[in-house]
């Protein structure tokens, strides 16, 4: 049976995912359709992780038990559609890494203000003496920190693209700041973007917390029909 995890995209999240996958005992293959930046190539070589650039070895990737994709890669690209047709598990870095940590996870999203809010939250927790990591759409790779650090908390800035790659993650604290039209080149409609943002509290239990802006009209309207 295959033990191969293929990583699509060799940027910060992809290389971090590769390092974690290797640590967890998987065979790892990193594939990037473009050119890999020198610092990421050097990191892959440091860990002895196999990679390719300038294209995809489709046959090899489709032999994977799992594909971890970078957030900028849409689910509609041909290789991912082929993988989905073959029932290969496809997920993002956050989903992949969350399975290997017991830390408290704080996720923050919103069309505007999420970076500032994430940085401030991380700063406050750090000043309180907590062992906290900063990751997601800001800071260093979440997966690499899970592989090499031992943080008790993670503050994650989550874009809609990252949320789309999360299927089972239960955030201990999910924060939704606001929603205004954005990334409509990626989504079929504004409603699709709204639903992507609301993925932040999918799968939360009654012991976990969903914090949102009650003054945001889009959020208020979506809450009427939203089921956790």
Language-model segment annotations:
Residues 1-92, 96, 217:
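N-terminal leader/targeting and accessory segments in enzymes
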Residues 4, 59-62, 71-228:
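Phosphate-binding loop of NTP-binding sites
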């Amino acid at each position: 049976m295959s033990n191969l995890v293929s990583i699509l995209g060799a940027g910060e999240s992809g290389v971090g995912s590769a390092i974690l996958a290797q640590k967890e005992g998987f065979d790892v293959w990193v594939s990037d359709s473009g050119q890999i930046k020198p610092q990421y190539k050097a990191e892959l070589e440091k860990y002895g992780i196999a990679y390719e650039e300038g294209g995809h070895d489709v046959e090899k990737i489709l032999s994977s038990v799992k594909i971890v994709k970078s957030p900028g890669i849409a689910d509609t690209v041909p290789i991912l559609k082929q993988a989905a047709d073959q029932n290969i598990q496809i997920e993002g870095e956050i989903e992949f890494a969350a399975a290997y940590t017991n830390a408290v996870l704080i996720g923050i999203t919103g069309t505007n203000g999420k970076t500032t809010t994430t940085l401030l939250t991380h700063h406050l927790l750090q000043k309180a003496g907590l062992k906290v990591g900063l990751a997601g759409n800001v800071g260093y790779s979440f997966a690499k920190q899970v592989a090499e650090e031992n943080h008790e908390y993670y503050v994650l800035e989550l874009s809609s693209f990252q949320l789309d790659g999360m299927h089972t993650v239960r955030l201990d604290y999910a924060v939704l700041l606001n929603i205004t039209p954005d990334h409509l080149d990626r989504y079929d409609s504004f409603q699709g973007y709204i639903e992507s943002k609301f993925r932040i509290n999918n799968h939360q239990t009654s012991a976990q917390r969903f914090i949102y802006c009650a003054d945001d009209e889009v959020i208020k309207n979506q809450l009427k029909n939203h089921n956790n």
